[in-house]
């Protein structure tokens, strides 16, 4: 019974066929090995875990059912650890680790190239060989280290999204932003419980079998990594909230600019419409006095052009014609003069008062 996409290696770096016979032979010789089961069906996993290894029924049940919170449970002589990692493709992978003092069994539904790469390094590794505690550490450390490149890539995406929003906000950017927020929420749901789990593990309240003081230092480093990852997740969530506010503010500002421009157009045409209506009245005085071309050009066209130019000058001075609504900078002669001595004092940092 061979299992595809899985591997079995012993602590000496040799790889073996994943089969029931091989596992039984290694168990009979008390050899230390690591068995990784990737994407196996429930019947195959049940046969290996229950019949071949003889694990506790509750341990088998928890190991076969995914979607659990990160946790550590002890069942007789086996300890179950549920750990989440992040792959290079930006998705979470749930790994169930069945740990004993002689062997380690890892189970996961989705492919995890990081664990395969770790197995390759172990096969090529020279002495010293990791013991059972450090083997579990290497597996968990590989999964946790996968978060950092994913978060670094997310940081770059947030920067690019923020720059794009400042240039031209679109509805598509909102979809990208909310996808990132959902991804961070999913990260938080698994990172924080893992952080608490390793805090308990390194405090001595729920130590692993065979844990030594030297190995505990390595597991404490995992706890430090999870604290850092949790802080990064919180920082990126706050940053995305700021990007969302930036998007909404930018859209609102652009809308205000459009409304302002339309208001300017309506304001310009308001006096023109008044003049047109006023001189369009059919009274005898206007009909008798505005009869020549110069009178028409002066009263009908010239007055409207003068009003339009006057309004544009007023709008220009108030800064209403600029896209950002800012007032044009003052001329150099109109700016207040600051001497070099005054500039030097302005540039100096404030000194703290002397303490009593």
Protein language model features and the residues they cover:
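Hydrophobic alpha-helical transmembrane segments and their immediately adjacent juxtamembrane loops
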Residues: 224-356
